[in-house]
């Protein structure tokens, strides 16, 4: 309890902190998003032991900028695009200020009636705002379900799986009364898509329930056919299907599982259907986006994070169940010191969660909904999706980038055309600046960049500024890779970035035959020219591949052979490595290893027996470089994108 004099101190310092927070949030876009610190950076700035005597508040307050802020990733910045949003707002901050002052532990109704009852009513508000079924409401005549605020969606998924497990084991014991619960548990199996969040796997580890991650369709969506097939296979193996986690808005590409197909299967097979809409749940404030909810009437539980996109700061997760009694039978413990006069009549949320104690989370949610109203919250969602559409249009206008998955809501995934190493290098260049925060993901073996519109204050100018930084990084990477160790003839190969349409870019490079040996066809060499370039600026793949003693005739003979040989071989290939550091993979069976491998010269001669003798005059590594140069599938008809040019080569190592 504070002394009267301390209230005045708190009042003054509180105003000072509010002023600091306002200044921080209003200027956060001007700060570098990611810090320039290394692990352990704070150790040297903080004493090894706590102070024996109190520090002054002025000293503590000064250390915020000196010690804390240099190591902060600024999640509220409009230039923070790495993860799904983690937004806040002034009503949310004020709500937690009050909740922290009250500091009640609402484990039972009796421990804080307002904490329990406000939460019940606000969860009903929220369910109606999202268009959820009536059976998720606390206050509805036909409902035996309701909603509760949990800490995270990860915890909600675990709670749902534990409830499903308990309910299924009780069903199994009715038919096998003598069976041990652990042996019954060992037969259980649950399902999710291979795009599901990592928390699903963790829930399986904790509950000791096997989780099978099922393949998705071309839109990264889990379909009913895949689920039904897995269920039938597992039942034949003696397993008992128990649980399905359907994701609405996956982490990687914001894909949506097909509830309308999964739901009927779960109902027919007796599986608990849990819906994870951690990010996308806020979008359902807009009725026109609720098409993804088709099939929600089959759900046994539903969860989403207001703490992501709804401007309610962490932690705040909504979790609804169709049947609260299945939840309570899983988590109910009832020691005498937790009983009260209204036990059994009032709702005690300690039976709806894993911990006993719980915070007064509903105040900040109540403040936010009342302060903004449904219409302004809907407008907030619309703004985020509009900004994502704008970024998508910028990416699509640049032919060196591609968007490998459909944009949904505020997430755009994109990549640099070509091998994964190009996209990885772009990310590294962007990370060096600290001005934009982006992270990678993978889909179908392609490395992608996730760009999420997060801040409610993001403008088109912010998006354009970040896009220009991305393009600058891409241009730098492409120029470095395409002119790595250039020969004098290649010094002008990559021009400064210019604005040209895709047709110009595609047709900007021509394949020509240059005869330097009179009428001898073997001395015709293939080179690549940009319009307006002289022969001195063209790229020759044979630089540095041969020793200095090799004649031009030798080089030209091998050039002609490789061109004709590999053009045919590439048409036979069924698989090709995407790595820039490995040889193309041939569909032809490799010769079995034998003792000749130990004798490099003999083995090399045997491998090259069908090649011209000039092959033996190449430098070490020269053959590999030339093979890569000519190994783009169906050369020369196909080409790999390299910067603002179309080069029929591997952009990282084909040029020497």
UniProtKB/Swiss-Prot annotation:
Post-translational modification N6-(pyridoxal phosphate)lysine, affected residues: 308
Record protein name field: Histidine decarboxylase
Listed Pfam families: Pyridoxal_deC
GO biological process assignments: catecholamine biosynthetic process; histamine biosynthetic process; histamine metabolic process; L-histidine catabolic process; L-histidine metabolic process
Modified residues annotated as Phosphoserine in this record: 343, 362
Enzyme Commission number(s): 4.1.1.22
Catalytic activity as recorded in UniProt: L-histidine + H(+) = histamine + CO2
Family, per entry: Belongs to the group II decarboxylase family.
Pathway annotation from the record: Amine and polyamine biosynthesis; histamine biosynthesis; histamine from L-histidine: step 1/1
Disordered: region residues: 481-502
Domain of life of the organism encoding this protein: Eukaryota
Organism: Rattus norvegicus (Rat)
Cofactor requirements of the protein: pyridoxal 5'-phosphate
PANTHER family cross-referenced by the UniProt entry: GROUP II PYRIDOXAL-5-PHOSPHATE DECARBOXYLASE (PTHR11999), HISTIDINE DECARBOXYLASE (PTHR11999:SF68)
Entry annotated with the keyword Nucleotidyltransferase: no
Uppermost EC category: lyase
Subunit structure: Homodimer.
Tissue expression from the record: Brain, glandular regions of the stomach, mast cells and fetal liver.
GO molecular function: amino acid binding; histidine decarboxylase activity; identical protein binding; pyridoxal phosphate binding
Entry binding sites for substrate: 84, 197
Free-text activity regulation comment from the record: Phosphorylation of brain HDC by cAMP-dependent protein kinase leads to enzyme inactivation.
